[in-house]
């Protein structure tokens, strides 16, 4: 897993509408790169599924030694789950 640590200073916060496969992936890469990520999906069930998948992905990366527990928590804290636009 390669995460770029070069962040455009004008893109420290991004919003993702739609937490399907692509939305979840984009959100995770952005959060792991240091961006604050606001995520929204019209279906609450998709937000819950996304949270569960994020936790599972970060747990796997931590267990494999790719990231530390502190990094995992920092990534999770960069997510802002939005239930309305």
Residue ranges with predicted function:
Residues 1-7:
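Intrinsic disorder/low-complexity segments
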Residues 7-60, 64, 80:
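NAD(P)+-binding Rossmann beta1-loop-alpha1 motif at the extreme N-terminus of oxidoreductases
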Residues 61-85:
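A structured beta-alpha segment of the ubiquitous adenosine-cofactor-binding alpha/beta core
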